[in-house]
From Swiss-Prot:
Substrate binds at S13, H14, N15, A16, G17, K18, S75, F163, G164, Y165, D166, K186, H199, R200. CDD domains: HAM1. This is dITP/XTP pyrophosphatase. It comes from Rhizobium meliloti (strain 1021) (Ensifer meliloti). The active site is at D74 (proton acceptor). The lineage of its organism: Bacteria, Pseudomonadati, Pseudomonadota, Alphaproteobacteria, Hyphomicrobiales. SUPFAM superfamilies: ITPase-like. Belongs to the HAM1 NTPase family. The keyword ATP-binding does not apply. Mg(2+) binds at D45, D74. Keywords: Hydrolase, Magnesium, Metal-binding, Nucleotide metabolism, Nucleotide-binding.
Length: 214
C-alpha cells in the first residue's frame, strides 16, 4: 500500500453533494481538496461495469490532468429484489432526456420496480449502499477502498438532508433514513473512530487507516 504524502488532492467528481461529503470527511485530516468541477475538468465516460472500475476511471483522469493525487468515489444503491439494481447504474436511473438528473424521479422508479415485484414488506426490500473510493497518483498507481451499509428501501421518501437516494434508505438498526440524519449522524465517523455508519464513511475509514495511518 502506498502512503499519501501530499496534502493537496483533487476530488474527482462533478457531483456537488458528493464533493461536499468528501470534503466533510477529508477536511479533519488536514487536506486541501480541489474538485474536478472547480478545475473545469471534462467528466470521463464511466464505461466500467463495477464500482471499482468506474472509480478508477475517474480518479486516474483527474490525477493525470492535474498532476496531483486524486480521490474519486463511485457509489450506488443495490436492491436485492431488483437483482442488485440500480447498482453501478444508480445515477443513470436519475437521468432525464435533457441530460439533467432528477433523483425524485429515480426514487420513484425504484419504488415502482419494487411494487412490480410485489416487494411491499420490509423483509423483501433489503438493500445496501456501496461506496468505492479510488486514490490515484499521476504515475498511474491506484489504491481502492470499499464500504457498504445494509438497510431497507422505504416509501414514501423521508427527510431532506443528504442527496441522491438518501431519503428512501433506512440503515439496519435505525428508524430514520439517511435523508433524516445530519451529516454527523449519517457518517458516524471521524478520524480515529473505530466504527462508521455510512458506506462512504466506512470506505474513508479504510482509506485513512491504510494511506494516512490515521
Amino acid at each position: 500500500m502506498r502512503r499519501l504524502i501530499d496534502k493537496t488532492l483533487v476530488v474527482a467528481s462533478h457531483n456537488a453533494g458528493k464533493i461536499r461529503e468528501i470534503r466533510d470527511l477529508i477536511g479533519p485530516l488536514g487536506f486541501e481538496a480541489k474538485s474536478a468541477a472547480d478545475l473545469n475538468f471534462v467528466e470521463p465516460d464511466e464505461t466500467g461495469t463495477t464500482f471499482e472500475e468506474n472509480a478508477t476511471i475517474k480518479a486516474l483522469a483527474s490525477a493525470k490532468a492535474s498532476g496531483l493525487p486524486a480521490l474519486s468515489d463511485d457509489s450506488g444503491l443495490a436492491v436485492d429484489a431488483l437483482g442488485g439494481a440500480p447498482g453501478v447504474y444508480t445515477a443513470n436511473w436519475a437521468e432525464r432526456e435533457d441530460g439533467s438528473r432528477d433523483f425524485q424521479m429515480a426514487m420513484e422508479k425504484v419504488e415502482e420496480a419494487l411494487r412490480a415485484k410485489g416487494a411491499v414488506k420490509p423483509e423483501s426490500r433489503t438493500a445496501r449502499f456501496v461506496s468505492v473510493l479510488c486514490l490515484a497518483w499521476p504515475d498511474g498507481h491506484v489504491e481502492l477502498f470499499r464500504g457498504e451499509v445494509e438497510g431497507y428501501v422505504v416509501w414514501p421518501p423521508r427527510g431532506t438532508s443528504g442527496f441522491g437516494y438518501d431519503p428512501v434508505f433506512q440503515p439496519k438498526g435505525y428508524d430514520t433514513t439517511f435523508g433524516e440524519m445530519s451529516a454527523e449522524e449519517k457518517h458516524g465517523w471521524k478520524p480515529g473512530d473505530s466504527e462508521a455508519l455510512s458506506h462512504r464513511a466506512r470506505a474513508f475509514k479504510l482509506f485513512a487507516e491504510t494511506c494516512l495511518g490515521a
